[in-house]
Amino acid sequence: MQERLIVAGEEGRRTGRGEMQVGRRSWSRALALAGLLLLLAACRQQAPEPEQPVVEPPRPGPIPQVVEPEPEPRPEEPPGPPELPPLFRDIERRTFQFFWDTTNEVNGLTPDRFPSRPFASIASVGFSLTAYPIGIENGWVSRTQAVDRTLTTLRFLANAKMGPQARGRSGHKGFFYHFLDMQTGERYDSWVELSSVDTGLLLMGVLFAQSYYTGDDPREVEIRELADRIYRRVEWPWLQRRPPLISMGWYPERGFIAHDWKGYNEAMLVYILALGSPTHPVGPEAWEVWTQTYERDWGVFQGQEYLSFGPHFGHQYTHVWIDFRGIRDEYMAMRGIDYFENSRRATYAQRAYAIENPMKWDDYGENVWGLTASDGPQRTTQQFKGEQREFRHYSARGAGLSDAFDDGTIAPTAAVGSIAFAPEIVIPATQEL
């Protein structure tokens, strides 16, 4: 849980820190030069002065008492990351094992859910590719094992059949269908869309693998080459049906999805990947117009002023791979925060919502909180405390200024996945849950 996984944005983070380091070095150099000048002045040979008559010095009087000024208090060092309880080590290991144990060893596809394994999710594959290096770093698998699994996955993705046909294909124009058959790797069913955001989550894992496996071994070289091929073939402008925004996806039976990615949500990574494409990029106006759709999402919720999106995963997913501390676009510069701080505020707002508990669910409180996309009990309407309440099976549950839904289902991933943003409230919540 303590790893910080970074792909895109690393250079910006380094630049920010680099500027700080230059400042410190400049200040240190100035102090050193000043000290050197004082030493030179003290050691410089003085010109002889004319002789003066010897005068008997007066008898010394009482020595005045020197009162040393009290030193100014030094500013406190910022606290380091808290020591994580053993529970988190167990969660980290179990999370890794889920991706390692459930993935199809033949093609590298990871199921959308477990223990039922009806289909693979390409987003899950992206998270699997990210998890394997964590297994290496912790000694849970060898580098050779992880390289083998990663190569299997990337070879399948690079060679998967693409085309406009409704059946027998894994994707089209470089994009992948959201759900694939676990065995064949082809589109699972006619209701499955060609997904821009799930392709984005897949690509984040692909590019993370490319960044991690930097060895000269031919197999690691192949990983980097395959990752490059997979990223380069995605034709981002093809999904700009209403430029410059990017559509959510496409169906071979009925064409492009009528909705574009707008408002603050997990699609941040879609625009980042599309802007950075070396072969089929979108123009910079795509980001500008996308951030212009933020306005309905900025405001105060549960005492926190931030860019709101109800389901908490929207404040987490892009941050898995990009460290946004100190990185601000024009919109966030205007607001005076960065996206990392925004996610921190969103985390506190989720907790405050559970403490207030406006729907009077049982057990909600300061350490029982977190609404995000997850499975639920069932799809039904039932009486609860004298009211008719809607309950759902799978749903993007959330608390915020928009996209809010609460049927009393707390998903532990909402809290645990925010460990980087607010460990001081996430640790007790995780222990309670």
Role assignments for model-derived ranges:
Residues 3-12, 55:
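Ser/Thr/Pro/Gly-rich low-complexity, intrinsically disordered segments
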Residues 44-46:
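Bacterial signal peptide processing site
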Residues 73-433:
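Ser/Thr/Asn(+Pro)-rich, low-complexity disordered segments
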